[in-house]
Structure formats: C-alpha cells, structure tokens
Amino acid sequence: MKATFYLLLTLFAIKLNAQVGINTQTPETTFDVVGKPNDTSHYDGIIPPRITGDQLANKFYTQSKKGAVVFATAPASNLSGQVINISEVGMYYFDGNV
C-alpha cells in the first residue's frame, strides 16, 4: 500500500511540458491547428466561446486573462466597464485595459 502511494505521488509530481497539435503529429508552436484544405467534408477554423455582451459583463477579467478571445453573439445592454466596446456582434479580445 505504501509503495503504491509513493508511486502515485511520484507520477503526479512529475511536471510535463508539451505542445498540443490538432491534425498534426509535429506541432510547431504551443497550440498548432492544421486545417484540411482539400477535404470538403471538414470545415477549417477555430470557433471561440460564443457569449452575449450581458453574459460577458457578469464576468470579471483580470490581467491574467489578457489575450482572451470571445465571440459576442449580442451587444451589451450597458456599455460600461469591460464591455464598453461590445456594441455589436463580433469577435473581441481582452487587451487588459478597461
């Protein structure tokens, strides 16, 4: 029992760094997505989280969320704070400034 515990503790203590690749065995960056341009049955692209401006207003983004990308499906009702610029449907990113 003790040996199993130490084995599991050792396995979970090992820190792994990896690159993630989608449709590739050799990712070139931290997150590498390779499309299938010649396969018409697959749609290429990345879809970010879809959320309304009002739903986004209920969340509090800090500097650690800088660079976050969302697709606003509706503008915010009250254009203030972190949703001051969410005035129409579209892709938005958080640059750390409110």
Predicted regions and their residues:
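N-terminal signal peptide c-region/cleavage motif recognized by signal peptidases
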Residues: 13-17
